[in-house]
Every structure is written in structure tokens, then in C-alpha cells.
């Protein structure tokens, strides 16, 4: 699995439990996944690219509009972690969030935590998968 340094530690923990190789990518000057470096980490053994919308350390959104189309061409699933901002960021008005919310082809799953901003019970979580 390819993941940015800013990705949530729970993804790393899951990879450890399931014996999945992790390839960590750096971030650019805006604290978003470095797409060029991400491309260099992908090979035939890559099972997923893990992105954040937004990430926990900085609150920035990975460039999903660049990542998903590239991965789609290579038949690599893209997961978007929206646990922190899934019930908040889509409703903010800015060029970045409006552009990033309409996920391009290639995004195969998202995760959301309604307990953060969705007024749900603590520990509630949602995973959505494309068909």
C-alpha cells in the first residue's frame, strides 16, 4: 500500500496486522501527497493508494484529482480517508474543496467518522465502496 507520511496511523497498523508492505511517500510544500514520488512507489504489487481528505496533522487535502486518474489507468484502487472531514469539508466553500469533492474515476472506497462532526455516537464509522 502506498500512503503519504501524513496518512493516519491506523492504516499503518492495519497493514502491520495483515502483513501488507507499506510504501511511504513524502509531501509537497502544501503538505499534500507528493504525486511524483507516489508514482515512483507504485509497481505491480501495489494493492492500494491511501489518500486523505483532509489529513490529520495539517488539515490539507491530497490531490485526489491527480492521483485517482493515474491509479485508475494502472488498475490500482484509491482509498480516501474522509474520517476527519467527511461531514464537514464538502460543505465548506472554497476552490480546493469544491474541486476535490467530486471524486474522479479511480476512487474505490472512502471512510467517514460520523462521530466527529456528524453528531453520532463515539466510535461510529462508515466505509463506502464503489461498485
Question: Model-flagged regions — what are they?
Answer:
Residues 1-131:
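Conserved PLP-enzyme active-site core in the AAT-like
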Amino acid at each position: 500500500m502506498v500512503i503519504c507520511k501524513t496518512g493516519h496511523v491506523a492504516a499503518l497498523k492495519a497493514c502491520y496486522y495483515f502483513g501488507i508492505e507499506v510504501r511511504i511517500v513524502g509531501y509537497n510544500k502544501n503538505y499534500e501527497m507528493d504525486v511524483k514520488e507516489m508514482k515512483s512507489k507504485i509497481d505491480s504489487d501495489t494493492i492500494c493508494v491511501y489518500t486523505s481528505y483532509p489529513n490529520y496533522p495539517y488539515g490539507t487535502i491530497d490531490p485526489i484529482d491527480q492521483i485517482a486518474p493515474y491509479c485508475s489507468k494502472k488498475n490500482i484502487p484509491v482509498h480516501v480517508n474522509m474520517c476527519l472531514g467527511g461531514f464537514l469539508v464538502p460543505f465548506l466553500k472554497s476552490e480546493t474543496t469544491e474541486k476535490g469533492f467530486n471524486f474522479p474515476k479511480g476512487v474505490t472506497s472512502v471512510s467517514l467518522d460520523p462521530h466527529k462532526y456528524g453528531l453520532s455516537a463515539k466510535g461510529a464509522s462508515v466505509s463506502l465502496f464503489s461498485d
